[in-house]
Amino acid sequence: MKRLICIFLIVVPAQLAFTQQLPLFDQYLYNKFLINPAHAGSDGYTSFNMTAREQWVGYSGAPRTYSLSLQTRILKRGYKIRKTIFNQTVFTPKNDGKVGLGAYVFSDRNGLIRRTGFQATYSYHMWLQKSTQLSLGLAVTGYHFIINVNELSFENPSEPWLSSNLRRGVFVPDMDFGIYVLNPRFDFGFSALQLFEAAAKIGDKTYKNFRMDRHFYAFGSYHLITAPGMEFEPSVLFKISEQLMPQADIGITYIYDQRLWAGLTYRTGGGLITNIRFRYIPDHSKWTALYFGYAVDFTLSEIQKVTYGTHELTLALKFGDSTRKYRWLDRY
């Protein structure tokens, strides 16, 4: 057991202190729920988003991330069944429309560390003005960390503790919070992730040097309509945590007829991101739209000599009808 503790105290903190603790995404512009829980249900649709990301292709042990997210808005209109004292069934209107729900799971490999995470989100939406919406979101999160023992060497790999405790890993719970403001012309938000900075518990002890650092995100964008069917959207995202240097993404996205998106983003610290996205609207279908996205992240640092860049694929499916979606919010 002591060897297990030593491995976690040396390998795990080193991995987490100098690499990203949270999954990194390039196409968050099209699914802000990944960085802000308040976004859940803000556009009135029910949407599914899938992402596959391969970071630093060609570099051994580089991060590889897969994620699946779901978000929805509770119907404004509808009815619920209520039993009266005479056991009669009565349909009464639901007093909803301001509540959003979301869920998010991911699997991430980063060097020797493999982790699986989940998030369950509750959001509340209210109108500040006729066309400006304020959203608040709170999420319960959990992360399961495990060391890939196949990439480690031991004198006696058949020891019992190696096959049980080490393979089982550790579970770290936490919470996220977010604020999001949405208007037809602009949007901005702030989120704080891993609020409690939870520490891993190995055996009967909690090790504070292996803890989840609090992360802060601030995002903003503005919508410019230059001609019928042609739009530009400049955006900026600031990220900061206790272990990593502040980082910013500064980008511009071209939108054509709400069917084609093409973007270019500069990431401080040495990164250039290009992305493209298409929307397909099938005839006589139950879903509203199907979205395909692809992004390439070119690293401008020394690591570019041994990699083929970072590649990210996304697939999104949106459901909605006139009773649950807000058409002026349908920007993506």
Indicate residue ranges for each PLM-predicted region:
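Sec-dependent N-terminal signal peptides
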Residues: L4-A14
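Subset of outer-membrane beta-barrel
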Residues: Q20-Y332
